[in-house]
Amino acid sequence: MSLGPWEIAIIVLLIIVLFGAKKLPDAARSIGRSMRIFKSEVKEMQKDDETPAQPEQQPQGYQHPQQIEAPQNLQQPNFQQHYQNQPQQPDYRQNYEDPNRTP
């Protein structure tokens, strides 16, 4: 099934009516820019794939860090003591009377 000249003319006419004659050149220009950017990115990725990544070399005299042992004399925090020393917050719910409450 191929498109004849009348079908192509109708499709072009519909595109012009839908998008407007003023927007078509801008749309074509932006599509062209996008295609150029896409092609350049693909070429750059292919170039990156062709050059193998060189392994990083450690500088001379580099030594791996030694493991540090944790000190043994650390005390665990006592959270209960901390909360006991906190001032007591007043309970505002005790004195609150609900105005919508029926007796």
Curated annotation (Swiss-Prot):
InterPro entries in the cross-refs: TatA/B/E (IPR003369), TatA/E (IPR006312)
Keywords, in A-Z order: Cell membrane, Membrane, Protein transport, Translocation, Transmembrane, Transmembrane helix, Transport
Any single GO BP term: protein transport by the Tat complex
Localization, UniProt: Cell membrane
Molecular functions per Gene Ontology: protein transmembrane transporter activity
CC annotations in GO: TAT protein transport complex
Domain of life: Bacteria
Gene3D superfamilies: 1.20.5.3310
TM segment ranges: 1-21
Ranges of biased composition (kind: Basic and acidic residues): 94-103
Membrane topology: Single-pass membrane protein
Main localization (coarse): membrane
Ranges of Low complexity composition bias in the record: 52-90
Region annotation (Disordered) ranges: 42-103
Keyword Amino-acid biosynthesis carried by entry: no
Role this protein plays: Part of the twin-arginine translocation (Tat) system that transports large folded proteins containing a characteristic twin-arginine motif in their signal peptide across membranes. TatA could form the protein-conducting channel of the Tat system.
Oligomer and partners: The Tat system comprises two distinct complexes: a TatABC complex, containing multiple copies of TatA, TatB and TatC subunits, and a separate TatA complex, containing only TatA subunits. Substrates initially bind to the TatABC complex, which probably triggers association of the separate TatA complex to form the active translocon.
Family note: Belongs to the TatA/E family.
Protein's name in the database: Sec-independent protein translocase protein TatA
Organism: Corynebacterium efficiens (strain DSM 44549 / YS-314 / AJ 12310 / JCM 11189 / NBRC 100395)
